[in-house]
Amino acid sequence: MALPKIKPYTYVDREHSNRVSWPVDPSRAVLLVHDMQVHFVQAFEGADLGEGNASPDAQINVAIRNLRRLIDAAHAAGIPVYYTAQPPRQNPEDRRLLIDFWGDGLQNDESARVLDALAPTDRDTVLTKWRYSAFVRSPFEDLLKESGRDQLIIGGVYAHIGCLTTALEAFMRDIQPFMVADALADFSEEEHRLACEYASGRCARVLNTVDVLADLQTAESAEGTEEARA
């Protein structure tokens, strides 16, 4: 049961019906680049894998560009950046029920590689991913607590599976989730939209990349004002 071949689509920008208006706070937030590995991205027709045949307007490529902006902004603001990455050649005892839905998963080191355009640096943390949620069989929650962080900015694939599940679990652990709609991609525009609608009404603030950057700029300006007064 392999991943489906995903047709290009564009996620239509819309006003999300958020029940919360949490601002992104650079002193509280971390960024999670979710499952942006070759195995998952190559399922998208026209995905930019560095081979020169990309469809620029396809949502996966919009997401890649926006994730790059978010990573750069996070580094500049001192926000820790985390990645999830599933390991290749998983033992059936580790993979278990995922086999029934998705088969054997990643089979080689190349398929497990994070895209070059988004590759982690030495300052970033890569979490081994075992289930839909980034928190399962992972030190993620402990790392957040140790660093005093309780906001989670999420971008990557797939919006309605791992990204949404991670947002839900963050919420249930009293960590404020932020789903960055234009830095996500999914099996279809409909599933992408449904994931964002569910998150905005049940567990997260859904926003776009420009909103994250604006919140960071507001926080930086406020900090500068406070320093000037001191």
Identify the meaning behind each predicted range.
Residues 41, 92, 188:
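Conserved protein kinase catalytic core
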Residues 27, 45-74, 78-83:
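A short alpha/beta connector and helix-capping loop motif
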Residues 35-36, 87, 157, 183:
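Active-site metal-binding loops of divalent metal-dependent hydrolases
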Residues 33, 79-86, 180:
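Short beta-strand segments at enzyme active-site cores
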Residues 44-49, 91-98, 116-126:
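Short, basic/glycine-rich phosphate-binding loops at helix/coil junctions
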Residues 1-30, 72-77, 101-230:
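Active-site-adjacent betaalpha module
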Residues 37-43:
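Short acidic, Gly/Ser-rich segments with clustered Asp/Glu that frequently serve as metal-coordination loops
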Residues 81, 85-101:
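Early exported N-terminus immediately downstream of N-terminal targeting peptides
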